A protein has these predicted regions:
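Active-site anion-handling motifs in enzyme catalytic cores
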Residues: 1-343
């Protein structure tokens, strides 16, 4: 039965589209986050660009707004035809400085508050301007609803295992050289940074490195929206059947929690509060951390007891079980999304 609202227009359902690219690459983790939102939608009538939420929309559209916002603060506030559920929301400090200069943006978020935030830093940023919030955790923790598998293979996946090194390397590449290089050379140049097998010897045994299949969440931006979502779902199905996943991507690690796939988050010293730590506080609390750093140092950094493993402490034939502390958040996220769609 079609739902209608007071205006008499049929209610439509939207899903985020992620076209923004970094040096010609897009992060498939954004699409994985939207796969989590898609689970709760009765259908998808249209795709809405995440960084152009003020685009033309001709009918009321329900949409779950989870993920990283806003790299394009000039495009806020969103179109009033959008009926949003703000959940698992992340806002970068630099973006917050810009977006909260306009009172209409603050008023917009207040209208749809409380805002579910996936990390503690976002809570602080919103509370500072009077927007009520709660800690929701990440919606990808619900992906087991659709993508879990009863099959468990012997595959080990190394998914951007040293992402912070990759990120720094990419950011240091000369923009001029990237622009002037032919496309093929450009991709090969980036590939040198994005497949760092030689860099992970200090974290993983050679046997695991040899067995592991490398997966990169950065993919070429010339793919269509449909192709990107197909790839995201392909990765989720891989992770669901894996014996072990080792990654420094939170939107690989969190889905693995949901899929009951043993996962180790490789932490190699992301100390920049604005760029990295802000994303991780509240998230890494619920997963196993693989690091060569001293456990006490990690606990002090996060201000609490964390699930920390040194490579030498791991039985690689029987990886440690995932913590279960995320499950209560996943249940609450599921209930909120289902209630949003029904009402």
């Amino acid at each position: 039965m079609n739902k209608k609202i007071q205006s008499g227009n049929e209610l439509s359902y939207g899903l985020l589209k992620h076209s923004q690219n970094n040096h010609g690459l897009v992060n498939i983790g954004d699409h994985i986050q939207s796969c989590a939102a898609e689970q709760f939608m009765p259908r998808i009538d249209r795709y809405v660009e995440r960084d152009k939420l003020n685009c033309d929309i001709n009918k009321p559209t329900k949409i779950i707004l989870n993920g990283w916002f806003t790299d394009s603060p000039k495009n806020w506030p969103p179109n009033p035809k959008l009926i949003p559920l703000f959940i698992s929301f992340h806002l970068q400090p630099k973006s917050a400085e810009i977006i909260f200069k306009k009172k209409e943006n603050i008023d917009y978020l207040k209208k749809f508050s409380p805002i579910g935030c996936r990390d503690y830093q976002t809570i602080k940023l919103l509370n500072k301007v009077g927007i009520s919030t709660y800690f929701s955790f990440c919606l990808t923790s619900t992906l087991g609803l659709k993508y879990s598998s009863k099959k468990r293979g012997d595959k080990i996946y190394l998914v951007d295992p040293l992402y912070s090194n990759d990120f720094r390397a990419i950011s240091q590449l000369s923009l001029k050289s990237l622009i002037t290089s032919p496309p093929i050379k450009k991709i090969h140049k980036l590939k040198e940074y994005l497949f760092p097998k030689r860099k992970i010897d200090g974290y993983l045994p050679q046997e695991i490195i040899k067995k592991g299949e490398m997966i990169n969440h950065y993919v070429r931006a010339n793919k269509s929206n449909k192709e990107l979502y197909t790839l995201a779902k392909k990765y989720l199905k891989k992770y669901a059947k894996a014996k072990l996943v080792i990654t420094s991507r939170i939107h690989c690690a969190l889905p693995c929690l949901a899929l009951n796939t043993p996962v180790l988050f490789l932490y190699d010293g992301l100390f920049d509060e604005n760029q990295h730590m802000a994303r991780l506080r509240g998230i890494l609390d619920h997963m196993n951390i693989l690091t060569t750093q001293n456990k006490d140092e990690i606990n002090e950094l996060f201000g609490k007891e964390m699930n920390v493993f040194h490579p030498k402490d791991i039985d690689w034939d029987n990886p440690p079980k995932n913590p279960a502390s995320h499950e209560e958040f996943a249940k609450d996220l599921q209930a909120r999304c289902e209630n949003f769609i029904k009402n």
